[in-house]
């Protein structure tokens, strides 16, 4: 991943979803395989520097003095040649046109910056004052830095990013293997009605660990551009179904609201996301994020699923029907004990669908028990 200054703590939201989305879009724009990245590499090879604003509005216009207006089509060779001039370049936000060249950027000097070089100080201040990314190419240090709302990323060679990405992918594979184990155990315990809060917490913990490492790899994919195609395919295969499973587990086990404690599915997911990596390793802390007390007694207490997760595995069963089945029967054990006639009592469930649900649940129950004991 590109080097990051002032990163937020793991598991915590940093500069905000807006800035994060803008940073991802900017990283994608300068990724290998793009015309902009090709132009930046040409600038480095030519032993020159550059300062490029990726967007133009009134705020950027007010900071520009001198130079000249071009409004020509963007190409990597034009970028390279125009960066030989003193001054900055201003592109459109879609990086299809070069609006201005040779301009001097004069941002508010009172804006704090910890950068030292003139070009980098200007890039940092401009990025904080406007809503567009700014790219600074250092001639002396031979590096490309990207600034978004004051956050700085130094772009690296694909080989360095791929090395870390492959390590992260190996970690994801181990995490996913362990997740499959604990999820399989949970399914078998659900059939036998032997689930404890500890079992649920272990699955929620593993799902969150997988989600986080997958998010990290997804950032590598963005930064790698065309070089990350194979990595993207591997990631998609490994995390298929993980995000829906995460929500289904919470929906199955989030405690019923009480006078002292109440937590929605969305709140539980937010609480899990807010945990640091250290907190995520503590089962009592994860249990509290789900809405339980987190005491040793609570971890060993019995709980019963509502049935969302198992019903979601029944083929061709719409979400609306799943909601009605859960609402009608109130729990997985009653669903498992329901006959075809009982299932038909639910609005929208005819004889064919009732048989499909009955057979699907029976097959899932048999396979879960076999996987646990064979």
Regions found by a protein language model. Give the residues of each.
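Divalent-cation
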Residues: 2-276
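Long, highly charged, low-complexity intrinsically disordered interaction regions
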Residues: 244-346, 351-374
